[in-house]
Amino acid sequence: MFHQIYSIHVMIDGTMTPVVYALLPGESQFVSTRFFTLLKEHMSRLNLSFTPTRAFADFEVAVHNAIRQVIPGIIIKGCFFHFTQCVWKKAQTTGLQIFYRDNEEVRTLIRRAAVLPPIPLDRMEDVWFQALEDLEDADIPHNTQPFTDYITEQWVEGDRLVWNHFGTEGTRTTNNIEAWHGKLKRKAQHSHPNIFTIIQTFKEIQNSNDINRIQREAGGTIRPRAKKYLNILPSSCHPERKIPEQSNRFDDLADSASQLLHLG
């Protein structure tokens, strides 16, 4: 009857909090559009506004199209972490991961691709094409073209506004939501729980969130984010702290930031 659990989370007092829980029968654009339409209608009946200006979502075209159809003008951003996963998965399918650990030039190529999101849009092509030029003199015992073609065609020539995070304020990943789904699975204690177990789990999680919210409002402490996540995107992501826009500086920035990524 149901194919997936879908949740919507919002930032409340600096904490990403689930506010909508849904059981969907599929992953198609029709299903996603129907879900967001019903949600919008339900909120209207409750006299609540449903006019978000920005949404974070996985890189799923069906979901993006559905959100844009129901909420015209919304800005959709993809998860930076999922972007790096897409890059690493392509490195695996094209055979480059075999050389990643021992070949510095392969490692640099993959990392430069993975760290494109924090580079300014008007400099991003320069950084990537510089990486391609560097390949001409590289000693790589494997064909890199399937990988570089994928990065160029899928991302550099694709919808850059979705995955580029230069200037993005606040969170740039959905890692906290992934952690929430992990918590949900542990609480359900079954790989295929029945609907009653799922609903009960939703209630328990919501009760826990309500308690945490009350504690925060009463002045309780909030567990700080891990420092590595705070620092993973450097100052280039914030317009007020731009570095001088020379191409070689952004090459250096890409290489430096890539050291914070955990690939392989």
Model feature map: region roles:
Residues 1-48:
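Electropositive, glycine- and tryptophan-enriched low-complexity nucleic-acid-binding patches
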